[in-house]
Amino acid sequence: RKIMALFDEYQSRENAKHTLRAMKENARQGFWNGSRPPLGYRVVVAEERGAKLKKKLEIDPIQADKIRLIYKLALFGVDGCGPMGFKAICNHLNDNNVRTRDGGRFGIDAIHKILNRPTYKGEHHFNARDHKTKTKRPEEEHAICAVPAIVTADEFQAVQDSLRLRHASFMSPRFLAPGTLLGG
């Protein structure tokens, strides 16, 4: 029984290795491997290969406008008043009744993920995290899948630079909080 259990365990590991390799190749070819697509995208059937349906991501026009609004708020703010942070964007969207795909309210974590996800500039990273430990994998293990871009690479980079400059490791949080007397 122990020998059979060891053989089954080995076979299971081999199957997992081959499945992951196939999914990485599928992603490199630009196909979606499953799961729920990011906000702003929808899954469409791209082609049929025998009984298998190959799917790709397509921009969902209604949801994509929300993503563009979030990036605009992060760069310019409301009416050009200056860049907004995660919480300010979240509050603005919820106050103006802008909802998620499911009709829920936006949270700070959702805004953080949207502003930091390279999928929106046209490159989805498959296999970016270890599913067991939830840790980031090295960049060379990622399979990059080309998807339609919702924001330009320049807009994405401008948001990343803005977020990095306002990060607490670059600037003290007391200078970021509005209303701090002589804080600037």
Tell me the role of every PLM-derived stretch.
Residues K2-G184:
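Conserved catalytic breakage-reunion loop centered on the nucleophilic residue
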